[in-house]
């Protein structure tokens, strides 16, 4: 337990008074986080890795993503951004406001929302190859952490 108490930078004592989460700011910051992550995701997966994704999808006899699927993925990105800023708001009393806490929130979302699914579905099942899995997973890290920083910058209690 000593390790975890060293990581925390909060000056609040356990059971101290915490402010309420500002839901309006969570939504605003979350939408910004989601938009930033979606744009970066397009650059990583659509531009840099687009031909590799298309080749892999063809090998699986799966058509390219439709406009409807792209819209759905972007809506999921917005929902992920809102969840991310909510996590930031929830851990902010313990770690303090700022970039470091936004990075912690981004890492938490990345581990659960990108790393674990990509390891299981892309690597363990061998569907898309390790190279694509590694690149898209590392791209996801950048997308989510940068989105977290942008979204957290708008959050105020």
Where are the regions that the model predicts?
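Short hydrophobic transmembrane-like helices used for membrane targeting/insertion
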Residues: 1, 6-7
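Juxtamembrane/disordered regions of integral membrane proteins
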Residues: 4, 12-157
